[in-house]
A protein has these predicted regions:
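Jelly-roll (double-stranded beta-helix
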Residues: 1-191
């Protein structure tokens, strides 16, 4: 369903496939992978399917709409909980070239991706299809450029882990030995 969120935590292993069905028009989506810390890599997998009506929204007086997928914005909490990275995940649709301040926890790394129109982020122009890494700070200022179209972006922030990352195919672990064990488990039907 348009506007839905699928949130999967792979943990010790999760085999899945995605086969979205398109009725008409253009279908698109965002796929985001968030690393787990070493202590959580072998947790049981879990899956959450969140329909659009269960994603809270904040609407400002000037018509800006903020969908709160994870974390908290303007005292509204998103439906995703219990994630070690303590993510902030917002879908922001700016109304009428308006400006919006978004607080970012000082403990988090963050990025923004403009998926419609173009926006200014802390004074820098970001065009459609561009992703920007955000520097440290307590907040960013987002401003739309157009009064005739919807300038939109996703903003994601999360607490970084000071741990090594080893990746091979679909596996992400902390050591080469853990990768070898994950491959062994997958080949032997243990996930």
């Amino acid at each position: 369903e348009a506007g839905s969120v699928q949130w999967m935590t792979a943990g010790k292993g999760l085999v899945h496939s995605e086969m979205p069905e398109q009725e008409n028009g253009l279908m698109w989506g965002v796929q985001l992978w968030i690393n787990l810390p070493a202590k959580s890599k072998m947790m049981p997998p879990r899956y959450q399917d969140i329909p659009p009506q269960n994603i809270p929204e904040v609407e400002t007086l000037d018509g800006t709409l903020i969908r709160v997928i994870a974390g908290t914005f303007s005292n509204v909490e998103g439906p995703i909980h219990g994630i070690d990275a303590e993510p902030l995940y917002l879908d922001v649709r700016l109304g009428n070239a308006t400006s919006l301040e978004i607080p970012i926890p000082s403990t988090h790394s963050a990025f923004a991706y403009c998926y419609e129109g173009e926006v200014y982020i802390s004074g820098n122009l970001v065009e459609k299809g561009k992703l920007v890494s955000l520097s440290e700070g307590d907040y960013i200022t987002v401003q739309g450029c157009s009064v005739s179209s919807q300038d939109s972006l996703i903003l994601v922030a999360g607490k970084p882990f000071d741990e090594p990352i080893v990746r091979y195919g679909p596996f992400v672990m902390n050591t080469k030995e853990e990768i070898q064990q994950a491959i062994h488990d997958a080949q032997n039907g243990l996930i």
